[in-house]
Amino acid sequence: GLPGGGAEMLVDSVRNDISPKKGEPKNWLRIMEEAQSLGLTTSATNVIGFGETIRDRVEHLNRIRDLQDSSLAQYNIGFTSFIAWPVQLETNTFGKRNRGSNKFTLGAGPTEYLRHVAISRLFLDSIEHIQASWPTMGVEIAQMALLCGADDAGSTMMEENVVSASGTSKISASEFELQKTII
């Protein structure tokens, strides 16, 4: 399959601010649809806490759901999982650039993350798996996410670049720790 990293927030106004060099949301959606049309499964991601509105989050989820519904109807394949996590503001470029700017509230804490997981599970009903993001939230919050609609704790990571580039410090968990989290 094709990993769905790079989606961040599929809303033009937010994406232009947080990652202007990554291109428009329609490009990410087009690439995912092309992969699905070729028979590849894909995953979808969502980073929250950039100062986006609830409406922006719903628009992101709706774009993913629309593509999922279309791909399932046309190709009988689509996204197999959805993974959301909060931006790690303390140590990444976006957080440093916007620290103290007061133009919007940055970040998303555990409660907001868990609420987003629950809403994602309800909204993305045709995506089989919602993954708990232990690499960004830690195993304790990931365990709570499993009670909020997530059904996948992910896996141990041998070599990981996307989440670690976001500045998180929680990317280490052993197989035993993950088993303990889900049992």
Regions found by a protein language model. Give the residues of each.
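Conserved non-cysteine loop/helix-boundary elements of the Radical SAM core domain that shape
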Residues: 1-40, 47-71, 97-108, 167-169
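A cross-domain feature marking catalytic cores of carbohydrate-active enzymes
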Residues: 4-6, 42-48, 81-86, 134
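A structural motif corresponding to the C-terminal end of an alpha-helix
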Residues: 30-42, 119-129
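Auxiliary Fe-S-binding modules of radical SAM enzymes
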Residues: 61-65, 69-183
